[in-house]
Amino acid sequence: NVGRMLHTNSLVVWLLLGFFGAAYYLVPEESEREIHSPMLAWLQLAIFVLGTAGVVVTYLFNLFDGNFLLGNEGREFIEQPKWVKAGIVVAALIFLYNISMTVLAGKKTAITNILLLGLWVLSLLFLFAFVNPDNLALDKMYWWYIVHLWVEGTWELVMASILAFLMLKLTGVDREVVEKWLYVIAALALFSGILGTGHHYFWIGTPGYWQWIGSIFSSFEVVPFFAMMSFAFVMV
């Protein structure tokens, strides 16, 4: 269903652009330094928009069907043609370089550190989109490395950093308190999210012990979200 593909891909693009925009606003404030290169930020956006347009046209008209480089891959959420994926990687590298140089040249805080960790790991996980093995079980394992570890891992780190920044600016609460909450939320997200990937491995051909690991750690995945909600209420 092309409409569904465009809908779900639009959601991902919307969130990623939101993360990019938040980082470009948040990092200079926290680092007390201007963005390393505004020109690179515009270049990154142009590549991202061009890639998005290419995806829409490819999906709508089913262009280059079956082509290794130019055709869509038919894998949910990561259907993009390889040339678009390569463009996404280039845009991500430009973004990470720009943000990292800004942080390194300025003031380092827990907020910028956790944000950078989330953004770097998010980008590295996307590299699994280039791995498309013939074995369906292996394909699903690599697929979940992206889909699950984005939602239940890296995105939580980015969201927690943004939330901490907002609480700091809106409530005037002590930075030390905010940073303690942030570290707790980040630790919970990584602890529950990484091994919680196992709940996607139940019936795809992986060893049986993943049923136990997935079941146990999946039950903790709600904790970081609850912690973020509690953090907001306590701070306000």
Positions of PLM-derived features:
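Membrane-interfacial alpha-helical segments at the cytosolic side of multi-pass membrane proteins
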Residues: 14-28, 154-170
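C-terminal ends of transmembrane helices
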Residues: 24-30, 100-104, 166-171, 232-236
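Hydrophobic, membrane-embedded alpha-helices of multi-pass small-molecule transporters
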Residues: 88, 123-129, 149-160, 218-222
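Aromatic- and glycine-enriched pocket-lining scaffold segments that form the walls
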Residues: 110-128, 144-146
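Membrane-embedded translocation segments of transport machinery
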Residues: 143, 147, 160-236
